[in-house]
Every structure is written in structure tokens, then in C-alpha cells.
Amino acid sequence: MNIKELVLKLNEIDAIKLGEFKLKSGIISPIYIDLRVTVSSPPLLAAIAEMMYQKVYKSGNAQETPALVCGVPYTALPIATGMSIANNIPMVVRRKEAKAYGTKQLIEGRFKEGDNVLVVEDLVTSGASVLETVRDLNSVGLKVTDVVVLLDRQQGARQALEKQGYRLHSVFTMEELINTLIEAGKLTGRTLELVQSFLDANRNVVVPLPPTLAPPAPAPIVINKPFEERAKLASNPMASKLFTLMSSKKTNLAVAADLTDKQQLLDLAESIGSEICVLKTHVDIIDNYDEEFIKSLKCIAAKHNFLIFEDRKFADIGNTVKYQFENGVYKISKWADMVTVHGVAGSSIVDGFKSGLKEYGSGLLLLAQMSSKGSLCVGDYTTQMIEMANNNKEEVMGLICQERLPSMTDGLVLMTPGVQFNSTGDAMGQQYNTPEYIIKEKNTDVIIVGRGIYQSNDPKSVANKYRTAAWETYQSKF
């Protein structure tokens, strides 16, 4: 089947509609292409899938051979399926929204990080739908170089995609479709005039992309500042205190003491206290907790000059977190120098901490990213957490993150969990990176090490090795 035959067949099955239609891009068009009807014509659907595949690969136009294909939801899904079956290429499916049950995945199917994916779409106007799919594929480690469509409406999609490094392949353009209909006598009179006027007015007019899909502004050049300088830039007093402590003690090592016995935790703190800047606790997992434990821990912290970080991960409304922070069995506000906070309740959660923070001088650490596999702290969520931190600098001392992003200001302490010399993972989804990689390549400030230290035979000696690796890597940046 050639292009002319295909266009006429689409017209025959009423896939080409004339009238007044509002496109996803917002443009009002006198012509609308509805390729959903092709699912009722299996031979035609198979022909479309094969023509699209040939356009990319059998003509040698592809940048890279795909390991997978993925259709943009929803019209392109049957096209991608036909392409997958006919050419024996595995397929992944992108959901428009993650399920709230089952696997809860946005991208379904078997794949591995770095696989190249051919994105399949029925037609493009601005390219927004394609870029939404590319964004979600990238979020799970998949790579995209090529996009194939049946129809390019010639209204900016090609430019938008190429600007972000993706090559667009189309079987035919809107101009070719219109010319075919004119030659076949299917488009005449007043309708022809309207369509022709529309094409003349909109040919290669770039439709603006939504802000979340527009090409990012160039990242500013990051000029690393030493901790003593950043202490002066911090609006939160605890952030300033931590920067100063790290600079004077020459350590940017935090240890996650995830132990369930209070004496074991106190012994660990005494053993490694001279090596660390922060000790991270989960007080609610301690089986034999009492107030004497807190008194002892504070004495050890004062003796060895480290701060206490309660990893509570508050996530409720402001009124509730106020009581969780200041009251109850643990009375966290009275002894924790810093606590972690999720942003799911919105920025109003910060208000719940204000009275306790003011009285005891502690700081909040917002969870912008996590080290666990499949974490939902990505994309827009991460962006909003950084914005929340920047808008509440007096209360927020820093971020829990996996990398420094341009919008993270110098007054925030960046702390990264999931650090081990052996950068692999565990059976429960934790993923590890080395101290050197986190401090130098990801450009964060504090490494958080847990089992790599407290499960070792000699925690103090191992802690010293992590301290040395992290501090020397930090110093090498200047």
C-alpha cells in the first residue's frame, strides 16, 4: 500500500472528518483525523504499523535500533502492538496515570535500564503527548532517540522534538494528505477553501508546549562554596550550625542507627561519635525506649559534638504534626536537632512545626528524593519540594535528595542516604551509591550510611573510612 492508497482508505472509513474541531493543542481546525476507527479494520491497521516501521528502520533513518516499542496512549497502542508482533520487538505500555493497586507502575512490561525505545504515535501537532510519554520512559531509565508517527500536522511538533534531541519520522504530512484528497476530487468548493486557508495560516506555526514539557533553561554553572561560607548563607540556624560543625570537625558523615535496642544504639553512638556530624535515629523502632535513653544520647552527642536527626518522616496536616512533633511519648521537638518531612500534605505542613522549631531551634529536612527502587519522589514532586524549601528557609534547613539540582540554594544542607562502598542494593529495594559518587558526581553535602557501618565488626574503624572518603572527596572540589 502506498501513501495515496492509504489516505483514500482512511477517507473511505471516515477517519478524515471535515467541520470544526478543537485539537488538544487548542487550535480550531476545519479538518480532523480520527485514527481510532482503524482498530475496526485489522488489515488496514497492520498496513499502517508496517508502513510506520519501514519509515524508520528499513530506510535506514533510525539513530539506533530499538529494544522496545511504546505507543502513546491511547490511539497509538494498537499500532504499536501491531508493529511489535509483526517485527518481533518487545513492547512496553505507558499508563496515563499510575495504578493505585497491583504493581502501581506507570510503565508496564519487561525492560532494563538503558534500553532504547521507539515511541509510536498516530499523529502530532505540538508534540506534547509524545514528550509526556518520553518523560515517563526516561523516569524509569529508558532511552528514546526516535519517534514515528503516521501524520505530521506540520504545526511545530518536529521542531519541538528535535530541539530536545528526538528525531521525528512521519509517513506523510498534512499537506500531502490534503493534496491527495484534492487530486482524488474528495476535497472541493468551500470546504477546500477553508482547509487551504487553515493550512496557509498554520503551516509550521509552533504551538507552545505546556511549561512542564518545554525545554529546560540551561542549568546555571554550579560554583561550589565551602561549608564555612554556606553557614553564612543559611537562613535556618540549625543548617548554619551543621555547616559550621562539619567545617570545624572535618566530617560530612551521618550514620543511620537503625537499631531496636537502646543500649546497642548508645554503644554505637559512643563508638562512632568522634567520626560523625549527625546520628540518625528511628526512635519508634526502639523496643525498650524510655526518657533516660534520650538523656544519655544527648550527653554522648554533646561529648562528641554531633547532631541528632530523628527520621520521623512527618506527613500529616499541620495541626496533627504539631502534636506529633511536640507531644506524645517521644516529645521529639525537645531533643531532635532535625526531623524529616514529606510534602504530600502541601506547604501548610510547615506551619505545624513553627512553634516547636522556634522554641528549640531545630530544623526540617524535606524529602525531595529517596534511594529506594520505584520511589514516587521524582519529577514534579521533587520540584515542588525544592520550591517548598526555598519558600520556607527559616524552618527548612535542607533536603534529603540523591543529587544537587540547580534550584537547590547554597543555604540548604543536602543529605543523601543509600551510601555504601559496595554500590549494589538489597532484597527490599534499597539502592546504594559510593561516597565518592554522591559527593563529587551528584554534588551533595552529607552521606548517610547505615548497615555498612553498624552491621560491621568494627563500626568505629569502618566509620572512619567512610568519613575519610567523603571528606577528601568534598575537599577535592575546591
Swiss-Prot record:
Family matches, as SUPFAM superfamilies: PRTase-like (SSF53271), Ribulose-phoshate binding barrel (SSF51366)
Residue ranges of the region described as Domain linker: 211-229
Gene Ontology molecular function, alphabetical: orotate phosphoribosyltransferase activity; orotidine-5'-phosphate decarboxylase activity
Alphabetical UniProt keywords: Decarboxylase, Glycosyltransferase, Lyase, Multifunctional enzyme, Pyrimidine biosynthesis, Transferase
Active site: 311, 313, 316
SMART domains given in the database record: OMPdecase
Residue segments, region OPRTase: 1-210
The EC number(s) this enzyme carries: 2.4.2.10, 4.1.1.23
Pathway: Pyrimidine metabolism; UMP biosynthesis via de novo pathway; UMP from orotate: step 1/2; Pyrimidine metabolism; UMP biosynthesis via de novo pathway; UMP from orotate: step 2/2
Residues binding orotidine 5'-phosphate, per UniProt: 280, 313, 316, 320, 371, 430-432, 450-451
Binding site for UMP: 258, 280-282, 316, 320, 371, 430-432, 450-451
Region (OMPdecase) residue spans: 230-478
Coiled-coil spans in chain: none
GO cellular component: phagocytic vesicle
A Gene Ontology BP annotation from the UniProt entry: pyrimidine nucleobase biosynthetic process
InterPro entries according to UniProt: Aldolase_TIM, OMPdecase, OMPdecase_AS, OMPdeCOase_dom, OPRT, Or_phspho_trans_dom, PRibTrfase_dom, PRTase-like
A Pfam cross-reference name: OMPdecase
Catalysis performed (reactions): orotidine 5'-phosphate + diphosphate = orotate + 5-phospho-alpha-D-ribose 1-diphosphate; orotidine 5'-phosphate + H(+) = UMP + CO2
Record family assignment: In the N-terminal section; belongs to the purine/pyrimidine phosphoribosyltransferase family.
Biological function: Participates in the last two steps of the pyrimidine biosynthetic pathway leading to UMP synthesis.
Name of the protein described by the UniProt record: Uridine 5'-monophosphate synthase
Gene: pyr56
